Amino acid sequence: MRVQDVGLLACPDCRGRLVWHGQSEDDRLDEGRLRCGGCGETWEVEDGLARLYREDRVRGTDRLMRHIYDGLPSLHDPLTAVLTPLFQSVSESRMRDGYMRRLELGSLKRHEDGQPVRVLEVGVGAGANLPRIRGALPPGLPVEVWGMDLSTGMLAQCEKRLRRGRGVKDTRLLVADAHALPFRDATFDRVFHVGGIGGYHQPAVALREMARVARPGTPLVVVDEQMDADFRPSLFQRAAFRALTFYTREARSPRALLPPDAEGVIEEQVSPFYYCLTFRVPGPAVTG
């Protein structure tokens, strides 16, 4: 994260502006603190990674899932690639393509004020979607990708992916909680989340936060587990789905939890086990 990026951040507690106090290297945050000009709270930055969340608010399934992801971060993506076709009879690539198209990345245009286009992935994990973002963007478009996650283990894997050139070059990573996104209102041109909201302790709050930080009119895309009503699973597939959704008895789309003013709502299955929920927040369409 660069020093000038701090202007896009907001205090997770009060949404006040943050000010950087610390060391920077090549204009990048290194070691120090982000201090809120409103409530005075400070947030640590270690090894260039901002930690903008409260540990005492990470509880229940949020804490459990973080523990799981931190324990096996290097195995997550390889297992997903192997198990998706085994469990669902559809490739991982086809499933990801099914929801990435809903982001309409190809329609993004330059901002008249010269600011880069900004894309946020809530729960970026090891960054499996980053190559697809890069491939879908219009050539030459200045874009920043922001990825946040509660798992430092997964973020470390994401950083390795970026160093290998498998993503968008201008990417920022930070540790944050989806229930209190550390960004100013209407910051991002695209916002999406894949594979975690079903385990959040307050999914409605997370949905409101995603809507808050999205620019009016932009598509927001949320993906997680839900058995396709038209799918006829085998006993093996039923057992696999139950294992994947061990954290809840009702794995389903949170459509009923969307903000009251959500519009253009589309709910669809992108694979036998995963739904894709697309919606927009009120306002004129974002064209540049």
What are these regions (language model features)?
Residues 7, 53-113, 128-132, 136, ...:
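Conserved class I S-adenosyl-L-methionine
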